[in-house]
Amino acid sequence: MEGKRQLEKRDFGKRLSLDSSLVEYMDSNKYIEHLLTQLEEQHRSLWREKLAVARLQREVAQRTSEGAMHEKLIHELEEERHLRLQSEKRLQEVTLESERNRIQMRSLQQQFSRMEETVRNLLQSQGSPEQKKEETVNIMVYQEKLSEEERKHKEALEDLHMVVDEDSRSESSSTDEGKEKTKLLLERLKALEAENSALALENENQREQYERCLDEVANQVVQALLTQKDLREECVKLKTRVFDLEQQNRTLSILFQQRVRPTSDLLLQKLHSRLLDLSSGDLLSEVERNRSLTQSRTDAEVHEHQLNTKSALKCPGLGAVIPGHLCPRNSYSSSSELSLSSTCSEYSSGSSYTWHDGKNLRKRQSSQNWDKRLSIDSSLPSGFASPTNELPPTRIKESHILEGLRKLQKRKVLLEPPSVITKWGYKDCMNSNEGIYSPGIKSSSLKEYPPCKTADLGSPCKEPHKTFVYDLDSHVDADDDPSTLALLQAVPNQSCRPHGSKLTHSVSDSLFGWETNRKHFLEGTSSVYPKERPEKLTSCASSCPLEMKLCPSVQTPQVQRERGPQGQGHGRMALNLQLSDTDDNETFDELHIESSDEKSPSDVSLAADTDKSVENLDVLVGFGKSLCGSPEEEEKQVPIPSETRPKTFSFIKQQRVVKRTSSEECVTVIFDAEDGEPIEFSSHQTGVVTVTRNEISINSTPAGPKAEHTELLPQGIACLQPRAAARDYTFFKRSEEDTEKNIPKDNVDNVPRVSTESFSSRTVTQNPQQQKLVKPTHNISCQSNSRSSAPMGIYQKQNLTKIPPRGKSSPQKSKLMEPEATTLLPSSGLVTLEKSPALAPGKLSRFMKTESSGPLFELRSDPHIPKHSAQLPHSSRMPSRRDWVQCPKSQTPGSRSRPAIESSDSGEPPTRDEHCGSGPEAGVKSPSPPPPPGRSVSLLARPSYDYSPAPSSTKSETRVPSETARTPFKSPLLKGISAPVISSNPATTEVQRKKPSVAFKKPIFTHPMPSPEAVIQTRCPAHAPSSSFTVMALGPPKVSPKRGVPKTSPRQTLGTPQRDIGLQTPRISPSTHEPLEMTSSKSVSPGRKGQLNDSASTPPKPSFLGVNESPSSQVSSSSSSSSPAKSHNSPHGCQSAHEKGLKTRLPVGLKVLMKSPQLLRKSSTVPGKHEKDSLNEASKSSVAVNKSKPEDSKNPASMEITAGERNVTLPDSQAQGSLADGLPLETALQEPLESSIPGSDGRDGVDNRSMRRSLSSSKPHLKPALGMNGAKARSHSFSTHSGDKPSTPPIEGSGKVRTQIITNTAERGNSLTRQNSSTESSPNKAPSAPMLESLPSVGRPSGHPSSGKGSLGSSGSFSSQHGSPSKLPLRIPPKSEGLLIPPGKEDQQAFTQGECPSANVAVLGEPGSDRRSCPPTPTDCPEALQSPGRTQHPSTFETSSTSKLETSGRHPDASATATDAVSSEAPLSPTIEEKVMLCIQENVEKGQVQTKPTSVEAKQKPGPSFASWFGFRKSRLPALSSRKMDISKTKVEKKDAKVLGFGNRQLKSERKKEKKKPELQCETENELIKDTKSADNPDGGLQSKNNRRTPQDIYNQLKIEPRNRHSPVACSTKDTFMTELLNRVDKKAAPQTESGSSNASCRNVLKGSSQGSCLIGSSISTQGNHKKNMKIKADMEVPKDSLVKEANENLQEDEDDAVADSVFQSHIIESNCQMRTLDSGIGTFPLPDSGNRSTGRYLCQPDSPEDAEPLLPLQSALSAVSSMRAQTLEREVPSSTDGQRPADSAIVHSTSDPIMTARGMRPLQSRLPKPASSGKVSSQKQNEAEPRPQTCSSFGYAEDPMASQPLPDWGSEVAATGTQDKAPRMCTYSASGGSNSDSDLDYGDNGFGAGRGQLVKALKSAAPEIETT
């Protein structure tokens, strides 16, 4: 209770308190209210105050404003008053003035009256009108006076009027009077004036009438003259065509008389007859012109040589020798027209005059040659002698050739299976026109030669000595006559005696000489590097050791093959040294010429290089190819003839000049060599001294050839690449030394350097070879040391001012030398390059060569010495191949050496690592940041010595270590560029050299510089070895990626571990990056050497897998490699063959490219010839590849696999995957290679262009068409090039590289075209495997021989590609660092990617894109274009090869990827260009995604090529392609469509075709497209996606594809072989038909290649190529069995169809494309755009900065065509667009690159739609072909969106109408259009004159074929 109360109380209290508070609360509330009211009042008062203030303010303001108004008014009033006063004053003044005027008027009136009186008097005096006329002048004078007076009067009157107006009131009356008076006077004046004017008019009218009459008369006269000229030209064309057709008929009759083997005999006979005709005519006309001076000498030397080589001639190689004898001339003279068909085309188009003009000379020379031959015949079998005596030159030639062919056939049969013989020798022979002569013979010789070689080992010293004397003697001749040189070099190379015999023949017939040489070399090499793998495998295995033992002789012969006697031990070394020296001296003389007048040297170098190139190509190609392998040799040989003939004239002049210096040089070198030679002879096998001596001597010799090759390479000796590398080195070193000697050019040591340089150049080049040779004898360390010291000594001697340290000498010395050379070169060469992009081809080539070659040579040589030393055992044979790849020594030896050095050369490796370690070891370990100081050297050195490390080297070289991660794939790009440069060395290297100059100038130069150097090095090392180079390029890109990303780990892991895996495996793994190069080279050497290497390490497995891959890769890499690869491939099986094919293709591309720069250098106008030469060489290489491939039906797969395995690093693990993935990997590799393609692109472009030229004499860029017969391989090489270019774009992954590529593309537009040509060429070559290779060439040009050769892509990209994932990932890492998958994984991914068009293309495309992106730089743009085109081409081709459908998918994907890469890297290229490129790329991606699936239809591509040729077909093809592309890349395609106009149509077409595509293809394509699209935004992402996503698809597809490809290849082998012979023009058709889908693909590729070539600058070749393309197209469509007959029939049909379609497409193109053809199809008149192809359609073509962007599209749009090409084709990019852009091509490739680029692109399109044989594939391919044209257009579009647009449309239309035929037709059209350019015109005319009908038919046929399919 209490508690409650208390609570209540509390509550109450609370309430109380509450109440009280309430009261307070209430009060407070009131108070608050009060306060609030107060506040409100205050607020109101404040407001009132404010308002009042405001009012006051307003009032104040008003008042102030009023005051202001007042002031204003007052002011105004004052002013008015002032004005009033002024006006009054003025009035007064006016009044005064008026008075004055009145006075003046009076005076004027008086004057007028006087004048009137005078006039009256005058008129009266005039009397009659005649009198008046007579006095008209007086009257006129008077009239003028009157007019003046009147004027004055008028002025006065005006003044008066003014005054009067002013003073009107006061002066109105006076003014009126004055006015009246003036009016009267004016009237009188007017009347007089009218009278006077009437008289004057009468006079004028009469004068005008008279002038008009004169003009009419003059016009009529001019028209009559023009008509007469046209008629004359037409007559010549027709004559040449008749001649060609007669030859073809002869061949066909023979072939029909005899089947397979008889066929092969007959083919040989046919070749022989053609050789006789061409050799005697062409070679005589050109070579004999040169030789006339040295004829007696040559005869004497030949005779002498006969004596020396009688035994050899009588050796198994005798048959080959004789053909060689016959062929060399043909090779030399009709290098452009490698075959009669080629000759006819070329002659009819551009070289006709040569053939025609040379007919008398030919007959005379023929008799001389026949006399020579008779002399030789005395030693030769009686069969040869009697024909020579009895028959006329042509008949004698024919009988000789036939006899030789028969004997070769017999020997071949003995040495290798008839199929191998027929396929290889014949296919080689057939594939390249030269190849027809040299490759087939090569194979025969080679095949039979191993015994000779082995037997010769006993007398290498003897023979070499004799040969040496002969060489010395014959050196001049050799200079004059590549045959002689080839023979001379071949003699040392070919088992001394056999080689001698070959040499003898070579003297007579460079082609056959070195063909036989090559064959013997190859044979010897083959025995060592199994050329006929299966049967030669044991030989190879036993021969490998033998070769190892023989290494001094065989290895040396390989080296010597490359270098001449070098490879044959000391005797051979001496001989070759002499030859090489002689050659090199020639080269050096040329170089000196070059050095002396940088510009002239460019020409001289071009000519001299060409001469050397031809000669060295003959010799070096003969040797290099023999050395490196028949394929390579063929390749080389093909280029040799190609170059020989185009360069023959220049060559002839320069040969004399060079000969003089050459003799002197020869003496110097010989003395140096002899000083070392006796030692070499005595101590070659001894080891250290030998190394030193040999290095000095042999290296000098090899250096000569290599340097020359390199030199030549940059100057367009694609086939001389190996030699170019060696010769280039020697050339450059010697050039430097000679220059120092003659013109202390770069190096300080003039005399020592002369001697040492001669030594050193050769030593470095040879030393690696010798070390390779010695390597077997020596320890790696010893050799390394020996090499190190020898090279060091040499280098120190050479580079007295350079770093002397030996350890550094190798790395640093090399670097020093390289810096010296590179610095010299970069400073002088690069600067020169930079400043002489135009001069760059020759000068850049030269400087680059000097930079690259000299330094590279030193570098390479040095690294080579150590590298080879280290890797000699492996490289022993390979080095031989490497020897021709001496530059690639770094690559091959570098790769091998690097692993070897890494493993074996522990001490040296650091040195080498610094120098080659920078390249190889450092590359492996790291980009070799240490070398960065000597980076330029390192670049050169590393690329040179370690092509695998080349990327590292490249990046190391140019890039800083920090750049290594970036450089790896930059390096891959660079490496790719390097390799590509080598691949497209002539154009690319040259371009790239320039481009590297540019690159060096630019930040990209880090990459590009390595690129140039890498190009130089890659090109030098990998240059000729297309395999080696390719390998190197391959390796470098691969290594670069692997090495770049996992720098040491991947590279070393791959390089060292895999190197450990058997050095071949290392070659395979490092080969993925480094061994790839090695492998490539090994494929070349390891084909023989690979086995040797692998024998050394794991002969069987490396041989099969490692070696097979490596050698195959190398084979792929190099033609020579191809030969061994063939042998090797045969033993290795498909893989070897595949890789060989790849290598071969690579060499083809490489060679072509090498040749291309020469072409470029020579002149963009003669690109056709050169391209044809290059194409021929490439074709040879391709032929070798084709042979290799046909030999291995699964060769494409095998190659791919080998490439893939190399790529994968796990030969076995990837063996199957490789097989399946091999293709994709090749694609990947090609991509990296394509990445390598910055240079490779160019080279590829060049290759493509060359290929196209070979293929299409008519269409320089479409080489493959005419050269189809012998350019099938070329076409493949072409394809390879095409593919390579696209491959390059991947490498282009790094923006820099891409810029570089583009830069090169501008320069190597040829390269691009060549790449495409290579791509197309490759397919033609190996319809199945070659197709794959071609596709890889296209899609991953490097991936396949096509890639490696066409671009580094084939080998480089192949290596790259085969290390593509590795390399690609590395390349891709720049795009997406994370994408860098473990090399193996990445490789597998790449493989899978390769297998999955999407994945592979994505990877390839992206890297290609990157590459392209890199090339977007104006310098690289064409290359980039090339690269993209190539990348896509490789994709397309790879897919085509791998899986036509897949290719389709892959190609599109590659396109997309490339586009992505391009887009990603586009910023690198000029914004506009980049944008254009991006558009193009998108377009291309669309088209390519669609095209990818149609890649399988690459064969139809030739149709677009033809259309491109004609410039009217392309739009259609692109439309078709567009459809496919649309499916995958509708958006991109739409953009393209906007850009290309026909894009939509293409897209629709593509869609339709794509729908038709197999679902797998579609899926893959879609995936690829998706991936591509993904990658479009993030390149890396796309690649990553593609890698991860499409690997399986690609893998599956690849698996499927290889199988398809295998059978097609097998079919292709025989039928293609026959067809090639039968249809030199129809060469593409043969493989295509046989290959079926693959064949179609190949054919398309070929055609596309032709197109690309056309664009690139081989418009002429392209035209001819397209002629052949259309033929091949028809042929391809024809069943394999009926291939021979139907090839011709189809050819006619195709041509007919092409004519109709051509016209139709012409119309379409006229409306849609920029290129317009007359209905007659006479010529493609580029629309303003087309004319601007370089500028407009080919915006990126010239340098294709946008090319890089469209580079992927390039694949579709042929942008890859050259421009590096420009860049490349870089192109260095054969495509339909090529055809459409021939003018551009001619302009830009002629300006060289644009056309090439366009061509490269177009061939891709062409290729895509090409496969008409496979219905779905055909349509798809048509679509693909269309995208290619689109790409080409894109490429052009980069340059000129409008131009590009019409091109794709054109391509689309062609694809749609008759993709195959139309593509060829487009090519023809383009060629005709391209014909607008100088060479293109020539070839275009040929293609059009002879090929127009064919093209039209082909196009027409294409439509029916398409319908059929």
Curated annotation (Swiss-Prot):
Biased amino acid composition, Low complexity = 1110-1131, 1178-1187, 1339-1366, 1454-1466
A Pfam family that the UniProt record links to this protein: NCKAP5
Q: In which tissues is it expressed?
A: Expressed in fetal and adult brain, leukocytes and fetal fibroblasts.
InterPro entries annotated for this entry?
NCKAP5_C (IPR032769), Nckap5l (IPR026163)
Ranges for region Disordered = 351-370, 736-819, 855-997, 1026-1469, 1486-1509, 1541-1592, 1725-1750, 1763-1885
Q: Where is the composition biased (Basic and acidic residues)?
A: 736-748, 1241-1250, 1547-1560, 1567-1576
Please give the coiled-coil regions recorded for this protein: 71-253
Q: Which domain of life is it from?
A: Eukaryota
Q: Which Gene Ontology terms of cellular component type are present?
A: microtubule plus-end
Instruction: Spell out the Polar residues composition-biased ranges.
Output: 753-789, 950-965, 981-990, 1066-1084, 1300-1325, 1428-1446, 1869-1878
According to its UniProt entry, one GO biological process term is: microtubule bundle formation
Asked if Repeat is a keyword of the record, the answer is no
Keywords from the UniProt entry = Coiled coil
Q: How does it assemble?
A: Interacts with the SH3-containing region of the adapter protein NCK.
Q: What is this protein called?
A: Nck-associated protein 5
Give the gene that encodes this protein. Answer: NCKAP5
